[in-house]
Amino acid sequence: MSIDSLNWKILKCLQRNARQPNTEIGREVGISSPAVSERIKKMEDANIITGYFTDVSPMEAGYQFKAIITLRAFMGKLKPFLEIVKTYDEVINCYRITGNENIVMEVVLKNQKHLESFIDQLIFYGETKTQIVLSHVVKNNALKPVK
């Protein structure tokens, strides 16, 4: 399924507010609410829309630190790490990447001691580098049509 210009308009609305009623979306894009529902359903079935998420504030949830941690896996440790990383509550995003490091993780931590403890778990799998996030400059930027 290709994403036509009308579907992109609907996606723009949903990316801005996934809870926006279909009647409002329809008004904004110029079609009926049932037509919006049908298009959304087709995009869900085609895995264009893969889910709807709640954005929770890490600070309000009790986490004082957000960090970016890269891991350069030791020989033979990458595959086991790719399984174990799924079990870490601290990891909110994890990417396998090219370059000197194999992994980039976005993690949330309660405090400095928690960070130290988490890094201690990771060093079994490889060499880590940690950067503390100071501020979130771009957050959940909406996807736009490919040019």
Which residue stretches match the model-derived regions?
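A compositional/biophysical signature of low hydrophobicity enriched in polar/charged and small residues
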Residues: 1-147
